[in-house]
Amino acid sequence: MKRKLPVDVFSDWAINGKDVGMEKNHKLSVDNMIEFSIKKLDYFTFLDAGCGNGWVVRKVSKLNKCIKSIGIDGSQKMIEKAKSIDKKNKYYCEDLLNWKPKNKIDLVHSMEVFYYFKNPKKLIKHIYSSWLKKNSRLIIGIDYYYENKISHSWPNECGISIMSLFSEKKWKNFFFDVGFKEIKTWKVGETKKWSGTLVITGIK
């Protein structure tokens, strides 16, 4: 199988409807991350990095505390789908490594995105410097990581050309090296064969 770039694979998923399953498969982890992130917030602005069809953007926008909910994704097809479903919130088709929001954000969330970059630390640094307000939070969830052995076959199974495999410690160090404080990691949805979603978060 010829491997494709992540953005091309996800565009295919948007066309064939595979994006719908992402909400079902990731709901438990996303709910956990959002609940943790907003419990001490009053009103907040929210950005979903790698938003796909916008399901998390829509979900968070319905919360009373949320004053703005934004989605960004590199896949034109995913953004077209998000905009067709949701006329209320803003969506941008952009390269995450270069894009900057007009106004900095209180909470940046991402589920199953960062390991599709050759150098995830570069993206984490860009978000820290250009997206986040002071004392605001980045929280990410990933299923493809070293300790989750069952995930190691995914690059071949999915035919994706860029998937960067790192340990929990390495991901935590990325946040530390960039300058985040109050860094925490935990896992959601562990079973005997599945190590769960690895959550990493920190405060700017």
Q: Which ranges hold each PLM region?
A:
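Short alpha-helix
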Residues: 163-178
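Conserved beta-strand signature within the Rossmann-like core of class I S-adenosyl-L-methionine
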Residues: 135-143
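A conserved beta-strand element that flanks and buttresses the S-adenosyl-L-methionine
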Residues: 109
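Class I SAM-dependent methyltransferase SAM/SAH-binding core
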Residues: 47-49, 53-98
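Conserved class I S-adenosyl-L-methionine
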Residues: 1-39, 146-147
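Core SAM-dependent methyltransferase catalytic element
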Residues: 187-204
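A short glycine-rich, Lys/Arg-flanked "PGG" loop and its adjoining helix->strand segment in the class I
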Residues: 121-134
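Short, glycine-/aromatic-enriched active-site segment of Class I SAM-dependent methyltransferases
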Residues: 143-162
